[in-house]
Design a protein with these regions (language model features):
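Signature for HUH/AEP ssDNA processing cores
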Residues: 1-113, 120-132, 136
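Flexible helix-coil linker/hinge segments at domain or subdomain boundaries
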Residues: 138-172
Length: 172
C-alpha cells in the first residue's frame, strides 16, 4: 500500500470497484458478486521475472481447495536466529524426501532469510493426508540428526486440515 507502506495480498476480483462491488455492505469473503480473476501465463511470467520493485507482480496461492484437498504441500523455513541457520534444516528435510522418493523443489523466500520446500501431488490429496506426510518427513529428519532442532521450521501450507466455511485458507 502506498498509504501505509506495508505489503499485503488479496484475491483479485473482476468486480472490484465496479457497480457490483459494495465494500460498504460486504466483506470480500461474503460478497455475492465475488468473481475471482483467472491466472494467465503472463501473470506467471511476471511473477517469475520479479521486476516490479513494488511487488505488484508477486502471486500468492491459496493451497486448500473447497473439498479440503490440495495439489501441494509447502513447508516454510525461516531463519529465527537459530544457531545453524535455516539451510541445514532444509537440507535435512529434503534428504528424507530424497530417501523416500518424494519429489521436491526448494525456493528461497522473498525476504532471503528462509526457504520453501514444495512437494507437488499428481492428483489432489486430502489436506490432512498431505500434512501427515509433512509431519512424517519432519519427524524423520529430526530423528536422523539430533543436533538439528528445526528452530527454523515455521509451518506447512495448507495450515489446516479443513477449509473454514466461506474462507479461503492461508496464503503462501
Amino acid at each position: 500500500s502506498k498509504t501505509s507502506g506495508k505489503a499485503g495480498y488479496q484475491p483479485v476480483c473482476q468486480n472490484e470497484w465496479t457497480p457490483l462491488c459494495d465494500k460498504r455492505k460486504y466483506k470480500c469473503a461474503d460478497c455475492p458478486n465475488r468473481q475471482f480473476s483467472p491466472l494467465t501465463y503472463n501473470d506467471y511470467y511476471r511473477h517469475l521475472e520479479g521486476k516490479d520493485s513494488d511487488g505488484r507482480d508477486v502471486i500468492g496461492l491459496y493451497v486448500l481447495n473447497e473439498d479440503n484437498t490440495c495439489h501441494l504441500l509447502c513447508t516454510d523455513f525461516d531463519d529465527k536466529n537459530c544457531e545453524h541457520g535455516y539451510q541445514d534444516d532444509v537440507l535435512a528435510f529434503v534428504d528424507v524426501c530424497r530417501s523416500w522418493n518424494v519429489p521436491y523443489s526448494i525456493e528461497r523466500s522473498r525476504s532471503g532469510n528462509g526457504a520453501h520446500v514444495w512437494i507437488f501431488f499428481d492428483s489432489p490429496e486430502l489436506a490432512v493426508k498431505a500434512r501427515k506426510l509433512g509431519n512424517a518427513i519432519l519427524t524423520e529428519a529430526m530423528n536422523r540428526d539430533g543436533k538439528i532442532g528445526f528452530k527454523s521450521y515455521d509451518r506447512f501450507f495448507p495450515n489446516q486440515d479443513t477449509l473454514p466455511e466461506g474462507g479461503l485458507g492461508n496464503l503462501v
